[in-house]
Amino acid sequence: MAAKLSVVVPIYNVEPYLPGLLDSLAAQELTDIQVVLVDDGSTDGSSAIAKARVAEDRRFELISQSNQGLSAARNAGTRVATGRYLAFADADDVVPEKAYRMLVDTLEQSGSDIASGDVRRLRSNEVERHGGYADLFATTRLRTHITRDDSLVADRMVWNKVFRRSFWDHHGLEFFLPQYEDAPVTIHAHILASSVDVLSDVVYLWRFRELGEPSITQRHYEPANVAARMRMVVETGDIILRLAPELHDVFAKDMLTGDVFWTVEAGKMNGASDLADSSDLLHRFLGTVEPAVLRQMPAPYLHRVRLFAAGRIDELRAEFAKMPE
């Protein structure tokens, strides 16, 4: 008999953190779960940790594959998952014991397609409020929708959610970007959903890595990472323009004050050739942003954004040099 909930966990070189995530899944108040572990070619002790867990808890199973990236690992796990509901967890994070019970119970009561909950940042053993989500999850709202509550444009991560599996399959949802893969899929799902439940309860602890390899989001200024971030911005924006264009101004403002800001900052330590792809992608994105949204940005900052988008990185650095320390 299929489990009520399947949780897909991609694994790649997370030996210091994987036991904590697996312990948190094993301790879930919702016990009727299937945990699909996908070892994406780990070269550390992660595979051995996963195999040991599978041997001791029949709810866990392991798929092993050559390294193909997070999107491919999630998609592989989803194909094996059989639960009526679907969730994703990253192998270096922690899921509070009550999380999946609350999210699934809410969906069963409301009939919504997605349930989403609040997030905290985990540093060592300290749990911090995540400023970006403070307002978004301040109150519980059932059977809402992104087109009626545009604050959900900021709810772009996949791991603080449970999806109704029939909804996921009906729309053929899958991950396709090699990095920053959450946003296009999550925003697409938000728009396609009949309704969404938003819980003020904390359902996920997102770790800041201090051991092992840094996470993708911790490598802000590496050229390949900068380009990957901008590709996410463009792909997500294109989905919004196609399916819910009335949300694009909110999305564009959020990007300009967040991901685009970090992209432009990368001009301080990288050359024009290294950032060529990122410049092209930012240029493409700016072409979709309404002038009224651009006018809301401080003029000096907008000038730096346009220099980056034009590939004029030397001039951008000169602008940074003029700024006070």
Over which residues does each language-model region extend?
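Nucleotide-sugar donor-binding/catalytic module of glycosyltransferases
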Residues: M1-D238, R242
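C-terminal subregions of glycosyltransferases and related glycan-biosynthesis enzymes
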Residues: F208-E325
